[in-house]
Swiss-Prot record:
Involved pathway(s): Cell wall biogenesis; peptidoglycan biosynthesis
Enzyme Commission numbers on file: 6.3.2.4
UniProt lineage: Bacteria, Bacillati, Bacillota, Bacilli, Lactobacillales
Name under which the protein is recorded: D-alanine--D-alanine ligase
Catalytic function, reaction form: 2 D-alanine + ATP = D-alanyl-D-alanine + ADP + phosphate + H(+)
Organism of this sequence: Lactobacillus delbrueckii subsp. bulgaricus (strain ATCC BAA-365 / Lb-18)
Coiled coil segments of this chain: none
Cofactors that this protein relies on: Mg(2+); Mn(2+)
Domain of life: Bacteria
Primary location class: cytoplasm
ATP-grasp domain sequence ranges: 134-345
GO MF annotation terms: ATP binding; D-alanine-D-alanine ligase activity; metal ion binding
Keywords tagged on the record: ATP-binding, Cell shape, Cell wall biogenesis/degradation, Cytoplasm, Ligase, Magnesium, Manganese, Metal-binding, Nucleotide-binding, Peptidoglycan synthesis
Gene behind this protein: ddl
Length: 362
């Protein structure tokens, strides 16, 4: 009998995307092939407490479950101890947001010498920052929405011209703007701005979540997403379409609320040559940011000329019931359990390759 792979499933975290992580982890736990894998959950509560394995199992079954003891003492050592157990063969982090998908956890996994699912340290750090990702996308020849970057020190300078809606909209050539934290996911902290009335409020909201805020031109058109899977030779899924109700956008509420007015359409109802361009751009961005394992790439099809405009790359896409990433590969013939298996095997392959690289001179 083949020995089953022991998987440490790490989820939760002190993040604005905590609930998304809990839901994603629960779905992975239910869908994983139990004939191939044993799951050892590691739950980080929303206050940063690393729970016991028994409590971690319980919250997967009851997402609203809370631990009675919530002492953060020696928390890092608790996480290291749980994640570095000899019996664990591979780690599967599904911690969204700050400290989870920005390279911090990935660096810890490298230090404790464990294979892990998803992108490595560099790609995690780079793709968490929307501005750096856009700069690299431009370098790869992929069109992006125009933007203005505002650092906190600029925001705190009352005389800075970037605090003027008229100046920024003039720079971007449109009154249709999105104000967003540069390092956040799930549309947290994003505001759609179309005039001066809520620009200051939008900046204040975004700066709650980051020290750098982007003001982007709003692209009028069709929102599409595609999924990428693999290491050195990645494959790209078909294209899915986000259909928003009139006068709405793909906000946090529309992504996760039961009262969402947004629907997902797979495959997207777009011309074949446009879908191919979306996939081609996604692959370019995946490779120039040195992603491995997985990523979801979001784009806009500009209504005026049909050009494919890169929006964002999510290197740790959600695995909720309504998440586009697993649905796109399901449409491509890769089931949810098989997708999880492939992600784990990709982590093992990358780890084995890393072991062949010399880190000191003989």
């Amino acid at each position: 009998m083949t020995k089953k792979t022991q998987v440490g499933l790490i989820f939760g975290g002190n993040s604005s995307e905590y609930e998304v992580s809990i839901t994603s982890a629960g779905n992975i736990y239910k869908a994983i092939d139990k004939d191939k894998f044993d799951v050892h959950p590691i739950w980080i509560t929303n206050s940063g407490y690393v729970a016991s394995e028994a409590d971690s199992y319980k919250v997967l079954e009851e997402p609203g479950y809370m631990v009675e003891k919530n002492d953060k003492t020696a928390n890092l050592s608790n996480l290291i101890e749980l994640a570095s157990r000899p019996e664990l063969d591979v780690l599967f982090p599904i911690v969204h947001g700050n400290l989870g998908e920005d390279g911090v956890l990935q660096g810890l996994f490298r230090l404790i010498d464990k294979p892990f699912v998803g992108v490595d340290v560099l790609a995690a750090a780079v793709t968490m920052d929307k501005e750096f990702t856009k700069i690299l996308a431009q370098r790869a020849g992929v069109p992006v929405a125009k933007w203005v970057s505002i650092k906190r020190y600029e925001y705190e300078d009352a005389k800075n011209q970037k605090l003027s809606y008229d100046w920024v909209s003039g720079q971007l050539g449109t009154s249709n703007l999105f104000v967003k934290p540069s390092n956040q996911g799930s549309s947290v902290g994003i505001t759609h701005v179309t005039d001066d009335s809520n620009y200051a409020e939008a900046l204040a909201e975004a700066f709650k979540y980051d020290d750098k805020v982007l003001v982007e031109e709003g692209i009028v058109g069709t929102e599409v997403e595609t999924a990428v899977l693999g290491n050195d030779h990645p494959v790209v899924s078909g294209v899915g379409q986000i259909i928003n109700a009139d006068n709405t956008w793909y906000s946090y509420e529309n992504k996760y609320s039961t009262e969402s007015t947004t629907t997902l359409q797979i495959p997207a109802q777009i011309p074949a040559e446009t879908a191919e361009k979306v996939q081609e751009n996604a692959l370019k961005i995946y490779q120039i940011t040195e992603c491995s394992g997985m990523a979801r790439v979001d784009s806009m099809l500009r209504e005026s000329d049909g050009e494919v405009i890169f929006n964002e790359l999510n290197a740790l896409p959600g695995f909720t019931n309504i998440s586009m990433y697993p649905k796109l590969f399901e449409e491509a013939g890769i089931s949810y359990p098989d997708l999880i298996t492939r992600l784990i095997r990709l982590a093992e392959e990358r780890y084995a390759h890393k072991k062949t690289i010399l880190h000191k001179h003989d």
